[in-house]
């Protein structure tokens, strides 16, 4: 299982991932990473479901606005957002969200997309395919065909208290 931990180091909050069989083992790994004398304070630990699409033939720059729009939404709502988007990134993000839902159901026994939230949806730059375009007088200009990685992290939705003020 994958667990997400939040930690505070020198006044800034950051996140990291740890692989473990259960929450106690994950907590032990996090405690080993940050010993008691360090200035880092672990804020929380929760189980997440991760899916990654690697080396997608698209520029990460063009798909990042759509990825940001999906963050914080329920998985079913995020699928609706990307389904009606005309961008090329929509197909890649949709497949990755569906893969993360399938990972949650098949590998970890989650109940489905109804109670999962998109915690993180990022498009990161990958390698570039180098090509050359022939130009005048026998010279050539380099062309970089960009690729990207899409990573989606789903977490269990927090149950909100109805009627709370």
For the regions a language model picked out, list residue spans one by one.
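Active-site lining segments that contact anionic ligands and/or coordinate catalytic metals
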Residues: 2, 147-149
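Short aromatic-glycine-(Arg/Gly/Cys) micro-motifs in beta-strand/loop hairpins
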Residues: 1-14
């Amino acid at each position: 299982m994958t667990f997400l931990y939040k930690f505070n180091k020198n006044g800034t909050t950051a996140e990291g991932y740890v692989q473990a069989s259960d929450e106690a083992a994950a907590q032990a790994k996090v405690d080993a990473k940050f010993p008691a004398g360090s200035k880092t304070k672990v804020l929380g630990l929760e189980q997440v479901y991760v899916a990654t699409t690697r080396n997608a033939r698209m520029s990460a720059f063009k798909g990042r606005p759509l990825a940001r729009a999906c963050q914080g939404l329920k998985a079913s709502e995020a699928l609706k957002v990307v389904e009606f988007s005309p961008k090329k990134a929509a197909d890649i993000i949709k497949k990755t969200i569906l893969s993360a839902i399938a990972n949650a159901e098949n590998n970890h026994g989650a109940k489905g997309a109804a109670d999962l939230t998109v915690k993180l949806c990022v498009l990161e730059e990958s390698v570039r395919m180098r090509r050359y375009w022939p130009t005048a007088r026998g010279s050539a200009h380099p062309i970089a065909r960009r690729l990207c990685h899409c990573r989606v992290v789903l977490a269990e939705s927090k149950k909100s208290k109805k009627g709370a003020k």
